[in-house]
Structures are given as C-alpha cells and as structure tokens.
Amino acid sequence: MSPRAKRRKRASPTDLYRTCKQAGTCPPDIIPRVEQDTLADRILKWGSLGVFFGGLGIGTGSGTGGRTGYIPVGTRPTTVVDVGLAPRPPVVIEPVGASEPSIVNLVEDSSIINAGSSHPTFTGTGGFEVTTSTVTDPAVLDITPSGNGVQVSSSSFVNPLFTDPAIIEAPQAGEVTGHVLVSTATSGSHGFEEIPMQTFATSGGDGGEPISSTPVPGVRRVAGPRLYSRANQQVRVRDPAFIDRPADLVTFDNPVYDPEETIIFQHPGLHEPPDPDFLDIVSLHRPALTSTRQGTVRFSRLGRRATLRTRSGKQIGARVHFYHDISPVAPEELEMEPLLPPTSEPLYDIYAESDFLQPLDSDVPAAPRGTLSLADTAVSASTASTLRGATTVPLSGGVDVPVYTGPDIDPSVGPGMGPLVPVIPAIPSSVYIVGGDYYLLPSYVLWPKRRKRVHYFFADGYVAA
C-alpha cells in the first residue's frame, strides 16, 4: 500500500482572489464569497427590499444586536448613551431696510462745550511802542576787505602712523580722562598715564620667543606621518650621510634613485650592510622633516625590514623609524680666565710626569709604620713639598716610600717595635657549677601538653646553690 500523500492547505479566499481575479483562473466559489454574491447573500438582499428591521442588527453582520446589543424585555441598557450637548438657539437678526427712517443729529449740543475765558482787549496805551519809518533810498553794502595785503591760509594734518614725531608732549589730565573734548597746549605740570610696553619678538633670545608668525584663520593643517607609534622601532642614525645618501648605509652598491621617493633594495641571501642598524632593510620611504621639543630639526625616514620569508615568497618584518637630529648652531665658547692670584702656588697632577719634579733621596730609611708600596716608576716629589703637611707622591714604585700627614717627622726618630706581651683574658675559659639541683624556668613548665619539641639550653633555668 502506497503512503497517502500529505494534504496541503489551500490559501485563504482573499489571497486567491487577489492573484487570480486579473488572470481569470479563480475557482468558482472564490469570487461569490469575496464579492458577497452567494445564494444566501442574494436572499437577504431581496428580503430587505420589503422588510425593515431597524437597528436590530439582523442581517449579514456579526449578530451582536446593533449598537445597544440584545437586552431582556422590560430592562434598561447597562451602557451609557452619550447624547451630547444641546444645540444653542440661533441669534435672531433683525434686518433693517432702506425704506425705514434713520435719525442722525448733525448739530451737536452746545451746552456741553466750555466757551473758555474772554480775550483781553488792547486800548493802544502802555506796553511796547512800535515806530515805523519809510526809506526810499537803496541800501549799499561795502564788501571790500580792509587793507591791501593778500591773506593766505594753510592747514596741515600730521598722521602719526607715517610721521615720526620729533617732540612728544605728554597729554593733560583732561585729555586722558576723556571728559574734555577740546584742550589747548599749556605750560606747567601735566598729568599722563604710563602704559607698559611688551616686546613680542626679538632677534636673539633664550629660545622662548615664538618661532612662527600668527597663523591664518581657516587654514587646515595636514596630518603628518605617525612616526612615533608603538608599531615603529625607533633607531637613531648618527651618520650624516643618512640625509643625502641613505642607500650607502644599506648596501655597498649605489643604485640610481630619487631621494624624494621610496627606495627599494634587492639583497642576496647573505649580506652585511655598511651600518648594522640597516640590517634586512628592503625599503626606505620618502623623507620627512619634523621639529623636536628642544627646537631642533629632525630628518626622518620610515623603513621596513624583511626578517622572515614564507614559502610563498612573502616577506614579513617590522617597520623602523630612522631619524637624524640636525644640531643647531653651537653657542660661542668663551675662554675661561684663572681666578687665582698670580702669587698662589700652582696645582700639580699626581698622575702626570713633569720635568721640574725632583727625585727623592733613596737613602732615607723606611719607616716601620704607614709604608706605601708603589710600582714600576720613579718616585718623585714636587717643590711644593716644602710646605708643612703637603706632599705630592705619584703612583710609582720601585722603593717603599713612607707617607706622613701633618707636620714634618724625622723617620729616624720614629717609634720602634717593642716585644709583644700576651695579655691573659679576664673571662674564664671554663664554667664551674656549684650546687645540687637545676630548675627549669616556670614559663617553660606551664606550656600546654601538645607543644612543639623545644631544645632547652643552660640559660633556660637556674642552679640551686
């Protein structure tokens, strides 16, 4: 018996209607159900033409009884019906026609207007007297200036921005305060305000002055290469050939290259570069000029080592930052003058050999105490040894030379070595115990039973005499 095929569920009528309506491939029961054109729907449509059921909800709806639902006969609905607000009565407008009279008072009532005080009347006597006269001759005006000389006027304006004043006069107190607008030059004491001036830039200083001009606003600085990251090994190059001939430090050959571009090196299997810092370097990138915190210019190049090589031929290595500091101009050195007076004794080096050092007398007997044994050079002392307590002895040998401090001492009168007498020690070499019993200290007796085994000593008790 063959297995029964699994029944697949058909899609909903709504989904089938959307896809098959336009193509015309819908099943016969899909279109009447979606468009509500079944036999039951037609009976309800025909019956509703002659029967009206109101809001009972009898029809093709959900059968909930309409808005208020189904309630028992003789009871009130449990829901509250919102009846809303009562409408306001309309405002009655009385139209006024053109035939109806309109009374407008054109003359105002004069009883409400104050007439004011009476005007004074002039009788012509008293007050000002006005004299009138009539002149018939024309008026002649003399506009010729007095004198026969020519008058010339000149004005000059001094711009302090372009003219250096020869004499500067301090302003008065009123001109400084700003309350007096016009003033004249007067003699005597003047009040003025002193403003301290600040020097912004000098030609030579201690290095704290600005090294660049005021930056232009809106200029965006271009990010430089990251030379001091953790991924780069820092190597300082002291050879100045690194600036113009970096290839000479990597290989003995001098390939044709552009110093402003990246230099690629091809090394044999075993090679030794002229500079050991450039071992296994296969490429040097273009140079970069930066500044350090000390104000010097630093010449830098990034390189790559080929330390490992895989089977596929790929080279793996670390990145190296080679840099060379361009030293600034060295400051001028001043010759130092000696500060000691010319009459003072010169200082001598005990390690230096001088021509004016005189050899010591080899017949001087050696002292039994404080003997200094020197090696392999002639013993000599300077002429400054005549001073009390000052003797210059170089590190030389060949003869045992006594060295003394303090005043001059004659070696022949030095103390001699007498016979040594042994001293009997006061502490006895053996211990004698006089008594019969030995008692342990109470602190050791009262210990608990479970204790660590402790070795007792003779000093942990006492002897009964």
Swiss-Prot record:
The keyword Magnesium does not apply. A motif (Nuclear localization signal) lies at residues 1-11, 446-454. Keywords: Capsid protein, Cytoplasmic inwards viral transport, Disulfide bond, DNA-binding, Host endosome, Host Golgi apparatus, Host nucleus, Host-virus interaction, Late protein, Microtubular inwards viral transport, Phosphoprotein, Viral penetration into host nucleus, Virion, Virus entry into host cell. It comes from the Viruses. Highly phosphorylated. Disulfide bonds join C20-C26. Pfam families: Late_protein_L2. InterPro entries: Late_L2 (IPR000784). GO terms for biological process: microtubule-dependent intracellular transport of viral material towards nucleus; symbiont entry into host cell; viral penetration into host nucleus. Its main location: virion. It is found in: Virion; Host nucleus; Host early endosome; Host Golgi apparatus. One of its GO terms (cellular component) is host cell. GO terms for molecular function: DNA binding; structural molecule activity. Transmembrane segments: none annotated. Interacts with major capsid protein L1. Interacts with E2; this interaction inhibits E2 transcriptional activity but not the DNA replication function E2. Interacts with host GADD45GIP1. Interacts with host HSPA8; this interaction is required for L2 nuclear translocation. Interacts with host importins KPNB2 and KPNB3. Forms a complex with importin alpha2-beta1 heterodimers via interaction with the importin alpha2 adapter. Interacts with host DYNLT1; this interaction is essential for virus intracellular transport during entry. Minor protein of the capsid that localizes along the inner surface of the virion, within the central cavities beneath the L1 pentamers. Plays a role in capsid stabilization through interaction with the major capsid protein L1. Once the virion enters the host cell, L2 escorts the genomic DNA into the nucleus by promoting escape from the endosomal compartments and traffic through the host Golgi network. Belongs to the papillomaviridae L2 protein family. This is Minor capsid protein L2. It comes from Human papillomavirus 57.
